[in-house]
Structures are given as C-alpha cells and as structure tokens.
Amino acid sequence: MAATFVANALQAVNFLGDRFLRKSHHPFTAIEDLYRHSMDSAFAVSESFLVTGAPHASAYYPRDFAWFYPDILDPDTIMDSQDAVRRARLLEKSVRLLLEAVRANVVTTTIVPAGRARYLGVNYFSRPSDTLLGILAGLRQMISAEERASSYLAMSQCVHAGRLLLAEYCGDLKRAILQLASELEPFNDDGSTYLLCDASAPRSAATDTRAERRRFVTNACVYTTFVWGVRLGIIDENELKRRLGRDLAQYKRDLLRLFGKGGYIRHSLDGPPGSPVSSVALDFVSVHRGFWDMSEPAERALFAATADLIIAEPRFRIPGTFHFLVSADNPRNKMIHKIAAPAYQGRSSWPTFNVEFADRMLDYDEFSCSDTYRSSAQGILKDIRTATEVHGGYQELISERGLKYRTWAYKGAVAHSWFPRFLSVWRRAHGTPLLQWND
C-alpha cells in the first residue's frame, strides 16, 4: 500500500508538471527532421529505459514493447550505425530490467523508478493482461534481429545478448507464464465453458483506463503470451494444455467463437449487447505478429466484418480523414480518468492503433491474395504523416477534432519511440521507404 501511494504521488507530480511546464524546444516540421529528433531523444545514451516520451519518462510500461515499439531494430528505420548501437543497447538494458522484475515476482502494469537503482512495481487500477507479452516482445525483438538483412554489427551483438538473457531467465518466465495460466477463470455462455483472464474483474491491456470485464483485447493478449512462450522455447505446449484443459489452437477458436458470435469481434461481454458499431473497438487489432495470423478463412471473415464496421461508421473517424477513433462512444472508465483524461481510450485517435490496423489490413490482403484494404491502409498512414508534421512530432493520441489531445491535467505525449513502427508499416504498404539515410 505504501509503495502504491509513493508511486501514485510520483506519477501525479510528473504528469501535472509536464502538463504545465513542458515546452516545445524544436522548430522542425519536415518528417525527416522530426524523425531524427525523435530517435535522438528516445535512444539517447543518457536513457536507462525505453519509454514513450514525456510525460511517461518517469515510469516504465512493459506492455509497450509489444504494443508500441515491437520492431525498433528494423534496419529500414535505423539512421546510422550510432543509432543502431543506441537502440540495441537500450533495448537490452530495458529487457534485462524487466526480466529482473519477473525474477522478483513483480509482474505489474508499471515500474516506477524510486531512486538509487530502486524500483516500485505498481498496478494502476487493475492487473495487467499484457505485461508478460511485452517482456516476451522485447526478447523476440532481440533474438529475431538476425532474420533481418542488416550491415550493423550491433544487430548481431543484440541477437547474442538476447539468447543469453533467454537462457538466464527462462525458468523465471516459465513460472510467470504458468501463473498467468492458473489465473484464468471459467466463463459459461450458451452451455459452453470458456477461459477468460477477466471473467470477474477488469484487467488492463494497452493502457490502464478501461474498466470493462471480459474484453477481447485482454484475452487475446493472454493467448499471444502463451504462443510466444512456446515459440521461444520457454514452455512446452503440452504443459500448457494440461493446465488449460485444451490446446492453444482450441483456446483461440474458443475466443473467436465467444467474442465473434455476432459475426464480428465484440469488444466486451460486460453488460448487455448494444448495436454492432457501439460494440467494437479499434484495439481488436491486437499486437504485431500476435493474435491475428489470418491463416484461416473463418478468422479472416471475422476480421473483415469488424474492420468494415469501423471503416463504414462516420462516428469512428475524425471527419475528412483516415484517423480512426478507439471507440464510437466513450467507454466505462475509472473515475480518475473521467475527471483527468476523458476519452483517453474512447473517442480519441491513437496513431499506434491506426498503424496496427493498417498492418492487419495488409496481413488480410496478403493471406487472401487481394488488395481489399491496401488503399485504406495507405490512407491511414498518409494522415498520420500529416498529423506528425502539423503537430511537430509523433503523437500519442489525437482528439476527436484532430487536435493535440489536452485536458486540464494531461497534455498528450510526443511518442518518440513509436515512430519507427510507423516507418516499418509505411514501407510495407507502399513498397518503398518513406525516409532513407546514407550511413
């Protein structure tokens, strides 16, 4: 309780100080200049952990490695060899700290530095569904760097460091994954029994604000955690099968059946169903190389039906743009968010969710051998580029009117470390990079 109070006090001071004291210190408007400034800020040698940007610099969010910077080692986004070294070193430093937290049984939404190499693990408002997912995402980034064609020595060094970390902390990660599996609860619906991580109480995913139970995004995160744990060799699938009473393929089919019974992915089963448009949310897209693999026609059909609902509904986008809001309506929130940051994960547009929406669209097109969504994906990315130049940096979120998101207590972050993911998906959508450098 005391640790939570201290962590909350530190965060309150940080956010309010940032809201009223932060100034813009650069005059850049060109996308290349903005990107270079962001990379110099996010991966500065003085940084001890990879964070979004102000005001989040005083807290560490493990989930962000899955949601917001899943491929910072993409060579197409790296400016030069120094940039590569800074990224690899900061990623390794961050992942090691997170693994130490797992070893200490601290699997929380947030880690708050408390001075002198001391840290406080805190769950803001609810327990996480995606903290282990973020830690595994960081490890996957390090180890999979060898799969990318790169001339940077730092990449191969990062691969080696990732393998050493995996070997050192494999037992701790396995224990944490089994603990997560043991926390799943039975949920009965139409005579069938499903396993949910939030059947009786909310769990957070992507951010801490939403207060609903039985959400698709939270349970998709748990499924993906199990799959990545198996693929990294941390845990054997048969051991998970014994714990869950079903294999992972069946577990995924169950989630699609439960949340997709209406023919689209319903955001939450908490409360009576509303209209289809009010029942979906943009975070259904999940994370990079996560829940959606698009290999099955039935899965693609559910994705397409949900995507089409969002694309066709005017309330889901900022007028005249391809900026899609998280929800057509504001969700049920904790009281503090209603007061301090209304619409934070509701009627606001998150560039990162839009980037992942575009990437899932491209996944759909690739597996269905079509160009169904390519133009929509390109439209999303074009408008994010425009917003980045207009607002002088890559935004954490944008208001429903297309402005910087601000409230009396919060001034949305310039999300420096989220910028590379945008460039990666831009190249995929257009076939050519948006920016190029000569090392």
Cite the ranges covered by each PLM segment.
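Aromatic-rich carbohydrate-recognition surfaces in CAZymes
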Residues: S58-D189, N219, R347-Y364, R374-A377, ...
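Universal eukaryotic N-terminal targeting presequences
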Residues: M1-A2
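Active-site neighborhood of glycoside hydrolase catalytic domains
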Residues: C221-K252
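Alpha-helix C-terminal capping/termination sites
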Residues: P62, D74, I78, A145-R148, ...
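Flexible, acidic/His-enriched mid-domain "rim/lid" segments that flank
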Residues: D208-A220, T224
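Acidic, serine/threonine/proline-rich low-complexity intrinsically disordered regions
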Residues: G233-R242, E296-R300, R360-S375, Q436-W437
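Extended glycan-interaction surfaces of carbohydrate-active proteins
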Residues: N8, A12-Y60, K93-V122, Q179-R213, ...
